[in-house]
């Protein structure tokens, strides 16, 4: 089922998400719905708060990105970054902030502890685009948006677009939820 994606001014995007304690049929359904919703919106990452569910869960599928066509979807539960290496700046966008892009400085490689779709504990090394997308989605779990990480002068350049999003002026090819009609669990 395709879920609506919560947008910029929605309070669920500003909350710290709760850790998951176990896997169950509801979690599996949420994961499947998130993957379907992300693909429908032509995204490469989606966090549970973006679909109105305040849990520490993200899905990533880089197969739509150039050079990553063979990538498999990844489910990340209760992520914790153990270490980072070097930093670089790259333009980012977000399904919750449609048609807005901006440069963000992030570590270019991370070591991550997390649980997978089967709730097995994993430690993985990620770099380049995978590291960036995972960090972007983890930010959602902590109530941070990519625009919060932009330099002040760059953020001022997109303020009109952010104000329009706050007023509900959104044009997307995927369903969205506004703060008046979102559901937080």
UniProtKB/Swiss-Prot annotation:
Catalytic function, reaction form: N-terminal N-formyl-L-methionyl-[peptide] + H2O = N-terminal L-methionyl-[peptide] + formate
Keyword Iron attributed: yes
E.C. no: 3.5.1.88
A Pfam family annotated for this UniProt entry: Pep_deformylase
Active site: 137
NCBIfam families: pept_deformyl, PRK00150.1-3
Descriptive protein name: Peptide deformylase
Gene responsible for this protein: def
């Amino acid at each position: 089922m395709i879920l609506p994606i919560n947008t910029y001014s929605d309070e669920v995007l500003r909350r710290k998400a709760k850790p998951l304690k176990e896997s169950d049929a509801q979690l599996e359904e949420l994961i499947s719905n998130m993957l379907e919703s992300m693909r429908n919106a032509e995204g490469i990452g989606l966090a549970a708060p973006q679909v109105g569910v305040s849990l520490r869960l993200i899905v990533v599928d880089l197969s739509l990105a150039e050079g990553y066509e063979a990538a498999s979807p990844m489910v990340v539960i209760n992520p914790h970054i153990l270490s980072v290496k070097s930093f670089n700046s790259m333009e980012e966008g977000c399904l919750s902030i449609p048609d807005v892009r901006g440069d963000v400085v992030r570590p270019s490689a991370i070591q991550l502890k997390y649980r997978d779709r089967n709730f097995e504990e994993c430690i993985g090394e990620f770099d380049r685009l995978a590291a960036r997308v995972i960090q972007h989605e983890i930010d959602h779990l902590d109530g941070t948006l990519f625009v919060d990480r932009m330099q002040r002068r760059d953020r001022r350049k997109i303020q009109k677009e952010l104000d329009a999003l706050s007023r509900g002026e959104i044009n997307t090819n995927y369903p969205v939820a506004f703060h008046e009609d979102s559901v937080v669990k």
